Amino acid sequence: MRTQSELESLFAEKPAAPRDRGRVDLLVVRLAPGRHLTPGRIEVSREHGLSGDRWGKGWSFRRDVDRQVTLMTTSVAELVCDGQPLHLPGDNLLVNLDLSVGSVGVGTRLRAGAAVLEITRKPHLGCKKFAARFGQGALDWVNDEQGRARRLRGVNCRVVVPGEVRVGDAVEVVSR
């Protein structure tokens, strides 16, 4: 497991993610804690979030509409996973897109495939499970002030327009 300073150094070496248009690199359906599927395509709806995802089944956040779908930047997931499977953070979409506060603020709408998602006010932060999987250094890195501003842990979204999303689809800012 990497330390906070190692993660920061490695992150600084990575090319910046695009601000306006990127791609969907991975789809993750959370079946149960620690159990994930990684389909090549998925339906996204207002009623269920990602089809089959435990959000739609009323898990721990009790179907909080502001947490329907979670996104994380792929390069950050690669760093914290450190060779482990990239689905382990449990975010629904891993994207090559800058999710920082300065790039995509609350209310920003993103088109991923045919679906449109809106970034919500709910912060997406690391927790005990995140620390157990990736170490205290990773948790500190994503949750410190700078990590929160860069949204290293990702963002929570609600579904505005339902539709299909596929791995390789564009993810782009529709409105800021």
What is the predicted role of each segment?
Residues 1-176:
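Metal-cofactor-dependent catalytic cores
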